[in-house]
């Protein structure tokens, strides 16, 4: 099932970068033979922020490796979708409809997050979902809690999202 193009969420990019699942990597190679990876500008923001946080917390001897990974990521970017007025309107509707994240801040994660960081990540997911809706691309993700909540909210208030199809979600683990 290599089709597309798809919009890749930050969680999917991270998952594909870490996985050793041969079927998933075969799927990704097949996808990349036909399409560029397409992401929202928000995904770039989240990834650069992640590299910068790692760099700040790293020992000096590890910082060069982190910076090299950041530069490689930026040099390898495919299509980056901006947050234009259409995506901003849809994201505003999502944020008004669903102001609070469905899950609490991460505590078991290597870098525990505060309530305000969790709210920011939730809003970033709303912007990424809005980009997927406006571009009419399925969203590949590894964050079912947030994106399923967003999709359900949109389905409960379709009048707030005229002329947009449903939010089509593909969990990256299902591609393997």
Residue ranges and their predicted role:
Residues 10, 85, 106, 118, ...:
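Conserved glycosyltransferase catalytic-site signature
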Residues 1, 129-176:
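Acidic, PIN/NYN-like endoribonuclease modules and their adjacent C-terminal/linker elements
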Residues 1-70, 103-105:
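Short, well-structured N-terminal submotif of metal-dependent ribonuclease cores
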Residues 76-118:
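Acidic catalytic patch
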Residues 34-36, 76-79, 133-138:
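Short active-site oxyanion
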Residues 12-13, 43, 87, 128, ...:
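Alpha-helix capping/helix-boundary segments
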Residues 108-113, 117, 121-138:
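Acidic, metal-associated active-site segment
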């Amino acid at each position: 099932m290599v089709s597309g193009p798809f919009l890749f969420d930050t969680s999917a990019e991270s998952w594909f970068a870490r996985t050793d699942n041969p079927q998933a990597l075969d799927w990704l190679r097949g996808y990349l033979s036909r399409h560029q990876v397409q992401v929202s500008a928000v995904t770039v923001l989240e990834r650069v922020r992640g590299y910068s946080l790692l760099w700040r917390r790293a020992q000096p001897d590890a910082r060069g490796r982190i910076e090299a990974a950041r530069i490689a990521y930026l040099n390898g970017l495919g299509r980056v979708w901006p947050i234009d007025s259409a995506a901003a309107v849809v994201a505003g509707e999502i944020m008004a409809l669903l102001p609070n994240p469905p899950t609490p801040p991460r505590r078991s994660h290597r870098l525990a997050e505060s309530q305000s960081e969790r709210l920011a990540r939730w809003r970033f997911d709303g912007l990424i979902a809005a980009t997927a809706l406006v571009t009419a691309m399925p969203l590949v993700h590894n964050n079912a809690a947030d994106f399923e909540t967003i999709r359900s909210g949109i389905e409960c208030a379709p009048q707030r999202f005229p002329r947009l199809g449903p939010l089509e979600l593909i969990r990256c683990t299902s591609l393997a």
